[in-house]
Structure formats: C-alpha cells, structure tokens
Amino acid sequence: MQDQRAEYDEAKDRLYVQLLDESVDNTVALDDRRSVDYAADGRIVGVQFAKPFAGGINLSGIPLARVVGALILQSGHKFRMVE
C-alpha cells in the first residue's frame, strides 16, 4: 500500500508506523513503549513506539510484525531491534 510508512518524530522521540490512511477509533497499549491503533472496523491503522533509540524496537506481539519491521528498515533510521 502506498499509505504505509514509518515516521520518526525527533522532538517527541516517537516512531509511528502507519499501515492505513484511516481514522483511529481505538488505541491499545501493549506496554509503556508500544501501542497499536485500530480503525472502527478492527483493521490496524498503525503502531507507535516511544523512545525507540533509547529502548530499541521490540516487535514481539506486534500485529503484522514483518510488515512493520520492513517499514522501519525502509525509513532509513538505525533503530536497534530487541526481543
């Protein structure tokens, strides 16, 4: 999909991986650094990672982890992947 992308906000130290260009209806926090946004129909809109440089990126338990990981790699940022 052309709407898919990973964007890092340096000021907020947050990485957002957008999977769909849809409105967010519900956000589910996986832990204190990761959350998943859902559309009203249950599709995944995006995934947010807080402090990705300090804590690394953990894809464990992330829906569509392979797609999310590929978009992060394509972003050009050098985030450390952790388990």
Report the location of each language-model feature.
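Small, basic N-terminal interaction modules of short regulatory proteins
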Residues: M1-E83
